[in-house]
């Protein structure tokens, strides 16, 4: 099915190179989601994935996909003329998240564990579950890298220079956060993080919001979406496109 994208683009007259690349990107992403067998069910799943994107991005992708679906129908590649529709809730305007001023996170705290948890999420985009699984053996301060293992997936992320001094005192342990050589639970991490953000005057900040702040800062620094996805351990950039 993927080879049909090239055939489709060949029939599009007058498209610029950038426009063709945009079509190709959107359609490859579409096929990644729906697979080789296009059906009402697979299209609904894809459409649901678009819900978090900006309306302009949704309209662009839906337009490209509908043109491609019509092309497939004309060529006899699919037995029905499928068509995607813009979800009604997409018409509601949502506020774009803003970068928060969180310099106070670097100041001393009565909740040092919560502070370090917050900084690891904010500065590296790590999930609490990933942080709790970190072993000291996974950290190399000399090369400023951290190895993250999650299920069958592994990735290497860079440790910001500012965090090196925060990690150094913990290098004699087994886990980064531990008690008696065993990692703490997620409930413990939640309580520590909650206490810390309350102390700093941000009671509504969650791990998810802090991870979003990492994404916003990366985009502010002109980091490519694919690179951000790689840092976060995401397989696609679909969930990041709403931040464009």
UniProtKB/Swiss-Prot annotation:
Secretion signal, residue range per the UniProt entry: none
Gene Ontology molecular function, alphabetical: DNA binding; tyrosine-based site-specific recombinase activity
All residue ranges annotated as the Core-binding (CB) domain in the record: 1-73
Keywords noted in UniProt: Cytoplasm, DNA integration, DNA recombination, DNA-binding
Domain Tyr recombinase: start-end pairs: 90-244
Database matches in CDD domains: INT_StrepXerD_C_like
Name of this protein: Tyrosine recombinase XerD-like
Source organism of this protein record: Streptococcus pneumoniae (strain Hungary19A-6)
